[in-house]
Design a protein with these regions (language model features):
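Eukaryotic intrinsically disordered, low-complexity regulatory linkers and tails enriched in Ser/Thr/Pro
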Residues: 1-133
Length: 133
């Protein structure tokens, strides 16, 4: 299991579990041009024209994309392929000590942690207990 960090346009950092699949990220001010990211490789796979276009490129109908949009979030909307995407995001810019552990496998589970390291440790511990989780 490997985690990578990437900055967002609003100055936050998102830490992603690269064992998981694909995610479409866009800032609220750029809803017509989300970035399509493939976290299996950890490299951006290109910018799409829209969320629907991103789903089309992934071969997934828009209706089957799971969504998560934290209230008041500064990082915008995250749309994920419904297949366990686990990531950690800072709750405030420049505050990596204030992280949230968010598991988007069901689009709902969310737990606030003490830090991004703490969140990563929790993910690793959960994976060790249940490799299929």
């Amino acid at each position: 299991m490997k985690f990578i960090d990437f900055p967002t346009p609003k100055g936050l950092t998102v830490t992603v579990n690269t064992d998981q699949v694909c995610q479409i990220f866009h800032d609220h001010s750029l809803t017509d041009a989300p970035a399509l990211l493939d976290f299996a490789s950890g490299e951006p796979q290109g910018v799409t024209d829209s969320v629907a276009d991103a789903g089309k490129r992934l071969g997934i109908p828009l209706a089957e994309l799971d969504g998560f949009s934290p209230t008041g979030s500064q990082i915008g909307t995250v749309l994920v392929v419904p297949a366990q995407v686990t990531f950690v995001r800072e709750t405030e810019p420049g505050r990596p000590d204030a992280g949230s552990l968010i598991h988007l496998g069901n689009g709902r589970t969310r737990a606030v942690t003490q830090s991004r390291k703490d969140a990563v440790d929790r993910i690793m511990a959960a994976a060790a207990k249940d490799p299929d989780a």
